Design a protein with these regions (language model features):
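A structural motif specific to WD40 beta-propellers
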Residues: 307-309
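Substrate-binding groove of N-acetylhexosamine-processing glycoside hydrolases
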Residues: 1-232, 428-429, 433-439
Length: 456
């Protein structure tokens, strides 16, 4: 150590982007006893991008974590906002709107939205901008999604379901854009994709979005926490896997690989589930050391009653199963022995059919606001009015399109119950009590989307 005068680094293709980390190492080796990591980080940001140092600091502060990975290696990120987020989510789930936390987060998301354009316009370091460009693009979407999600939550707090639904659709579109960027940019590197705010901020937006979806689908008889949303998911009663993230694609759902031994006690399991309107095409597993007696694979239509998947040899640690019951919506591997199993989870994925024959009734009643049934011009959907006190429609489409809801009586008489813009529409019983069914159709040249029909 007494002869050390410097250090060597090899940032490979990200030389400029690596300078923040290299600067910190340099400050540490220069004066180990008085090293201040926070100050070194601030100095690095100021030195590398003096023209837009605050914007660059904001970008770096919320881009530390590599995202979910098989090594379970995560970095601290957005540390100053963990407590406000926890406070806000806890309050929101109790139908309150913690304003202090909301204002703090609203300011942050506004800064995040503005930071990329400031970096683009003010920094002359074109090589650095080129290296971080995919993350700058994604970062702006993160800020917009966070802002939209907070507006969505406030609308729900104000008991404005119509505006909540508008903001829900906006937040959904922004999150979809982030998914698209993650799947299309930076695909040649390892790890692939573009993840920003992956430790704290992005999970917060998704949590807020999903909680609001449950709120919207709730009724007087079904509380938000009782709403069972049909989305791709993983489930397990193995402690080691409970925090393992879900790897979700357009037509796939599975576990992010875990490169450590997983201990599976008797009757413990790991499983996956997918949307109610989709049918599985295949199931692949890669579970080294699992090929031993007592390992069973099972499927279920409802997540409660399970049936054995036949003809899966216990001699194979990995395999692809293509004969899956069309009713299956869940698959799990369970330790059916009286001994502990030790295995690796390198692959556990279901692939759904890309062009399934979708039952439109499932699309409109699947308890998933992200899916929808296309209602084309001239097409009609009928809803029976028996034994319901209210019916809600979650619709989306062009602002130029109108929707018409007509009541049909037993003797064939028709009367318009609603005619107007698409969006959230709720009809109380007094509006249709004289009718046996309702008929919904679009007025215009374009189709509309029926995301959900909720009968109360």
């Amino acid at each position: 150590a007494g002869t050390m005068t410097g250090f060597v680094s090899n940032p490979i293709e990200y030389a400029e982007a690596s300078k923040v980390a290299i600067f910190g190492v340099g400050m540490y080796t220069w004066n180990i006893e008085n090293y201040d990591p926070t100050q070194a980080w601030k100095d690095a940001c100021d030195f590398i991008m003096p023209e837009a140092s605050m914007a660059f600091r904001i970008f770096c502060e919320h881009n530390c974590d590599p995202g979910p990975n098989g090594h379970q290696y995560r970095r601290e990120e957005s540390a100053n906002y963990v407590a406000p987020i926890q406070t806000f989510l806890a309050g929101y789930k109790k139908n309150t709107f913690p304003e202090q936390s909301a204002n703090l987060l609203g300011t942050l998301f506004a800064q995040i939205t503005a930071s990329p354009s400031m970096i683009y316009s003010q920094s002359p370091n074109k090589r650095l901008i080129e290296q971080i460009n995919p993350w700058l693009i994604q970062f702006e979407f993160l800020g917009k999604a966070g802002t939209s999600a907070l507006h969505m939550a406030h609308a729900w707090y104000e008991k404005d379901r119509s505006y909540t639904w508008q903001r829900y659709l906006e937040t959904s579109a922004l999150l979809d854009s982030m998914k698209l960027i993650n799947r299309t940019l930076n695909q040649k590197a390892q790890p692939k994709g573009v993840k920003v705010g992956s430790k704290v901020l992005h999970p917060f937006i998704v949590d807020l979005y999903r909680q609001t979806g449950r709120n919207l689908l709730s009724t007087d008889g079904i509380a938000p926490d009782e709403v069972k949303v049909s989305i791709p998911s993983i489930f397990t009663n193995i402690d080691q896997l409970k925090s393992q993230p879900c790897a979700e694609g357009d037509n796939t759902v599975g576990y992010v690989p875990l490169f450590e031994v997983v201990k599976v006690q008797p009757n413990q399991y790991l499983g996956i589930g997918w949307e109610i309107q989709k049918e599985a095409e295949s199931f692949c597993f890669n579970l080294p050391k699992s090929n031993q007696p007592g390992r069973v694979f099972e499927w279920s239509a409802d997540g409660k009653s399970w049936s054995l998947i036949p003809h899966v040899s216990t001699e194979n640690a990995k395999d692809t199963i293509r004969t899956i019951d069309p009713k299956a919506r869940y698959i799990r591997m369970r330790n059916n022995s009286d001994q502990q199993m030790e295995l690796y989870v390198l692959g556990f994925t279901a692939t759904t059919k890309q062009d399934p024959q979708i039952n439109e009734a499932l699309m409109m009643y699947d308890m998933n606001l992200d899916t929808y049934k296309n209602l084309n011009p001239g097409e009609m959907i009928h809803i029976k009015c028996d034994d319901i006190n209210a019916v809600s429609f979650f619709l989306s489409g062009s602002n130029e399109n109108l929707v018409s809801i007509t009541g049909l009586s037993q003797d064939g008489e028709k009367n318009i119950v609603y005619q107007g813009n698409v969006g959230y529409i709720k009809l109380n019983k007094t509006m249709f009590e004289d009718f046996s069914s309702l008929e919904i159709t679009t007025i215009g040249k374009e189709s509309i989307h029926i995301h959900q029909i909720v009968r109360e």
